[in-house]
Swiss-Prot record:
This is Insulin-like growth factor 1. Keywords: Disulfide bond, Growth factor, Secreted, Signal. One of its GO terms (molecular function) is growth factor activity. The lineage of its organism: Eukaryota, Metazoa, Chordata, Craniata, Vertebrata. Residues 111-118 are annotated as: D. Transmembrane segments: none annotated. Disulfide bonds join 54-96, 66-109, 95-100. The gene is IGF1. Residues 119-153 are annotated as: Disordered. Gene3D superfamilies: Insulin-like. It comes from Gallus gallus. Its main location: secreted. Forms a ternary complex with IGFR1 and ITGAV:ITGB3. Forms a ternary complex with IGFR1 and ITGA6:ITGB4. Forms a ternary complex with IGFBP3 and ALS. Residues 139-153 have a biased composition (Polar residues). It holds the Pfam family Insulin.
Length: 153
């Protein structure tokens, strides 16, 4: 009886091993398929070349890169060499007709504005007076010469 049990155990082990071998081959074939598919995709996108940005895509990219600063369509003075400025290349020339990277896009961003400092009350000029106070002051001084008579208003 013990021999039969051991034989049945060996038979189950053998069948289980064969099942695992088939399963391993199936898994490895699937992995090779996906690996080949990934390589094919990467190769075809690299052969396609760099992309260009035109129209709304260019504006969206500039808004993303520059954020709240805003951007210019032509380079502000002071960017690049003097020979480049003579050609008057703009963002469309550089990123629509050719490909450009993020650094090139960032060159067209407006400069960062320094935060406005709050002025103290002492530093304010008399012209900074609110309009209502100015009008009252003007009314009082524009009454003219009434002599010493007091008029109620």
């Amino acid at each position: 009886m013990e021999k039969i049990n051991s034989l049945s155990t060996q038979l189950v082990k053998c069948c289980f091993c064969d099942f695992l071998k088939v399963k391993m081959h199936t898994v490895s074939y699937i992995h090779f398929f996906y690996l080949g598919l990934c390589l094919l995709t990467l190769t075809s996108s690299a052969a396609a070349g760099p992309e260009t940005l035109c129209g709304a895509e260019l504006v969206d990219a500039l808004q993303f890169v520059c954020g709240d600063r805003g951007f210019y369509f032509s380079k502000p003075t002071g960017y690049g060499s003097s020979s480049r400025r003579l050609h008057h290349k703009g963002i469309v020339d550089e990123c629509c007709f050719q490909s450009c990277d993020l650094r090139r896009l960032e060159m067209y961003c407006a400069p960062i504005k320094p935060p406005k400092s709050a002025r103290s009350v002492r530093a304010q000029r008399h012209t900074d007076m609110p309009k209502a106070q100015k009008e009252v002051h003007l009314k009082n001084t524009s009454r003219g010469n009434t002599g010493n008579r007091n008029y109620r208003m």
